[in-house]
Amino acid sequence: MELITILEKTVSPDRLELEAAQKFLERAAVENLPTFLVELSRVLANPGNSQVARVAAGLQIKNSLTSKDPDIKAQYQQRWLAIDANARREVKNYVLQTLGTETYRPSSASQCVAGIACAEIPVNQWPELIPQLVANVTNPNSTEHMKESTLEAIGYICQDIDPEQLQDKSNEILTAIIQGMRKEEPSNNVKLAATNALLNSLEFTKANFDKESERHFIMQVVCEATQCPDTRVRVAALQNLVKIMSLYYQYMETYMGPALFAITIEAMKSDIDEVALQGIEFWSNVCDEEMDLAIEASEAAEQGRPPEHTSKFYAKGALQYLVPILTQTLTKQDENDDDDDWNPCKAAGVCLMLLATCCEDDIVPHVLPFIKEHIKNPDWRYRDAAVMAFGCILEGPEPSQLKPLVIQAMPTLIELMKDPSVVVRDTAAWTVGRICELLPEAAINDVYLAPLLQCLIEGLSAEPRVASNVCWAFSSLAEAAYEAADVADDQEEPATYCLSSSFELIVQKLLETTDRPDGHQNNLRSSAYESLMEIVKNSAKDCYPAVQKTTLVIMERLQQVLQMESHIQSTSDRIQFNDLQSLLCATLQNVLRKVQHQDALQISDVVMASLLRMFQSTAGSGGVQEDALMAVSTLVEVLGGEFLKYMEAFKPFLGIGLKNYAEYQVCLAAVGLVGDLCRALQSNIIPFCDEVMQLLLENLGNENVHRSVKPQILSVFGDIALAIGGEFKKYLEVVLNTLQQASQAQVDKSDYDMVDYLNELRESCLEAYTGIVQGLKGDQENVHPDVMLVQPRVEFILSFIDHIAGDEDHTDGVVACAAGLIGDLCTAFGKDVLKLVEARPMIHELLTEGRRSKTNKAKTLATWATKELRKLKNQA
């Protein structure tokens, strides 16, 4: 009884009662989990107990079996499997008995069954479960509640378990699901549970989709369910079609004409948002699939082979029907629309963009009449839809086809930036931004640039949602203007460009925008800072005085922000404060990159003092630490060897960054900075190396360090060796052993992420070896004898390269590094290398691949390495 009372108190409005109940349950779980779970399952299984107690008991069981965090979930599953088999059997019997006895939804028992199943099925336990669940659904005497909760359990299992674990059960599971979906099933609740279960099972029913008769049957049942009068079932059935289209595109031709086309077009026209959304999503998915198929076709053509799968061009064929519905849907905006609400109007915009990318030129004649007819419509909804449609089709069709249309539309768009409706102004600003990004020649022409700049500068004072889009337009415009400027051959940046005359005003207005009191709305503040960064980055020489001024403003702001820290009261203040620090650091990086060396020397003391203050105050915020480390990196780049005077003061914070592996982005930034310091300070970094090397080696040996940090550390060993030359000898043995271990790493080849990671790891090992060989051999004509310390490892290094050559997943980056290292080994060790390479013909194939590579680095290094090998051959 006591347990029931306590479970009922888990929903108590009295906070003390509630906390006491939670503490009791936590203690019970720790003291004796098996007994506790058996007791809970007893409470759950007894229909005489209150609904509150049963739901709470189910929740406790479920939460002891599963978690959103995959690592914790795996621990819980192991903990469950370690419980005595009798106790587990008792819990399983009780939760199975509960199915069908609950009068509330969703069923708690179904979640418990799924939690246990996901732990036991992968280790071949509980074999009787799936047959039992199938029997519950197919037994003609089962109640509605029994069928519904059982199908929910099946759905949860399918959702959470690795599809491979259920492959051999797919027929039975599918039988139960289809049974619940049939149009003869009287209960819509059962139909809904079955349709949701099907949605979760589609990944592992591939064998059933491969068989024509079974596929016909599944498709028939799903299509019938899309006509169910219950909206919930209709939406779930449409979700199935959306997913089937992605998974089984190749099989859809039979169903497209007779069924899918009509069903989805009808759904798109529905007044019920959820239904319309699925209809639109279906065609967005068709576009995604057909774009992938287009890429596959062009790759196959390049390699002179037929593609594995071909596109049926459904999107192109449906344009004339889809576009009118989508443009009509664009007119259903909500005036005070919240950015986060996904609705048919937004989905229609995305679908139009995908259609434009997928069907290219073919879409223009279908959309143009709507734009022309409504861009000056007195009803703001139609004006907005016309501008939106125009913005959506700018990417995909040939620029040459769009350019005359855009130039013709420019005066109207500039006018619409001052429209009485804020929605129209917002969309017009977005469309102008898209034009600046995708068809900049239309924006930077002599006729429209001046009026466009005028209207954009005014737009910065508009509502946050409009101003935010204007900021983005400025970013794209600056980049386009910079690329279009004339550059003298020997110069890196143009002397002047088309934004020069308005540059100072634009920068001033953007700085004012970053200070707007409503800057936290619609990301306006960060958009304005990002725009400022782009404009400074893409500025011509004659804008330099304005860049100098901006640098001083940013430095002043950084100091002001650091003084505000003591006044922070609330968490939301702290978040805004941290965001502002990060934005200022990022902006500082961009202005520093533009500042000339002698100017940088004048301001570096103040900049460094601010950054050091930031490190002292932000011990708690990883994001800010990361941005501050990146800003130091930029200062190091700009100052070069002159940075040495700050090293003593900065050293402790570099150490803190390297130790902060819990926030691995911070650690990555610190490791990257070590590389920059090596390049800038060269041998002057020697006094700091012992400490840095110790921290780097500790991180490599610590399994809690995020895996992405490790390749960067290996690569930085090469930077250190290159900087300190012979002084690296004292670290050589331990580093070479570490590299030998790392270069033998193996991963699961079916996991693409791990294949990428392996390439990263290998590239870093090669970079490290390269730095060590170059550092020890020195840059004099005669090779320094120190390099002979590496000689015993040369054969291993070449075997490693040979192993890479034989792995077809290697990247261009790996090929480039391997080729560079081969060349360095030739110059350091001479004819010994030749013998070892000759014995490994795969290495020659790797160099041939490098010489034919499309990336410059691989081509250059492979050609050089081949020449070095040839030299040795001629000497021999």
From Swiss-Prot:
InterPro entries: ARM-like, ARM-type_fold, Armadillo, HEAT_type_2, Importin-beta_N, Importin_beta
Gene it is expressed from: KPNB1
Ran-GTP binding as annotated region, ranges: 334-419
Residues that bear N6-acetyllysine: K211, K835, K867
Residue intervals of the Importin N-terminal domain: 21-101
Gene3D superfamilies: Leucine-rich Repeat Variant
UniProt key word Protein transport: yes
Protein name according to UniProt: Importin subunit beta-1
Native species: Homo sapiens
